[in-house]
Amino acid sequence: MNEELAAYITHLCELSGHTTQIDDDVILVEPSKDLIYDAFTTRKDRYAYGHVERYSFGGAEFSSASFEIFKKFAIMHFAADI
């Protein structure tokens, strides 16, 4: 993940009140006390987005209201790669 993208995503997280930390190519996002999400990372030449342990595009956590900003950014980011 390039530094500019990492900084942008981290800034979006902070604006929405989330805590972030960068670990290698993974931006960990903590939206609440008990839940830690992986905002963006690369897995086998593709982008993954979702829960840090599943790297999935589905599930109840992915559709939560507090996570809408990340879904919208993911759509824009994927569209740029098409």
Language-model region placement:
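N-terminal "first-domain core" detector
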Residues: 1-42
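Short aromatic-glycine-(Arg/Gly/Cys) micro-motifs in beta-strand/loop hairpins
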Residues: 32-59, 77
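Broad hydrophobic/π-residue packing in well-ordered secondary structure
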Residues: 6, 45-48, 63-64
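Short alpha-helix boundary/capping segments
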Residues: 58-66
